Amino acid sequence: MAEARRRWREAMPGLDPARLVFVDETWASTNMTRTRGRAPSGVRLVMAVPHGHWKTTTFVAGLRADGVVAPVVVDGAINGELFAAYVRQQLAPALRPGDVVVMDNLACHKRAGVREAIEGAGCRLLYLPPYSPDLNPIELAFSKLKALLRKAGERTVDGLWRLLGRLVDEFPPEECRRYLSHSGYRATPS
């Protein structure tokens, strides 16, 4: 594993940041809430926290140096079949010939049809070394996304999906370039 990470880091400078598209998925739920807060000194912080039933969804997207691409919300958890359909129907049409798609080394990302759809769009597919979320800048975007979801505290599925659609615009190009840079990639083409 350490050797695979070393090889990946050696190859990183040769990757054109304008061509990189990092793809991943994360969960979102109707029970998301902040776990910490502030109140005036001596005053107890009181806020509503959801208990009981909630609904979990999956948010799938790609991250480029200039923004989020091909965002989709899936009802429930994602599996290999749904991920392959996402790549064919949403991601591949959003790619530009010559792009390099980078994904985690998960079984559902290696489902039949995923590589074919990406290569059919004139792009290349690379898998990150196992256990390397630090090399995937979309993880930083998802961290911000979840903080914004917790702050909003949406409690309905429809509201959660609408909120996710609006929050996609909260990732301007300069911020996306910082995510790439933080993960060790060149943030601008040389």
Q: What does each model-identified segment do?
A:
Residues 1-190:
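Short functional hotspots at interaction and active-site rims
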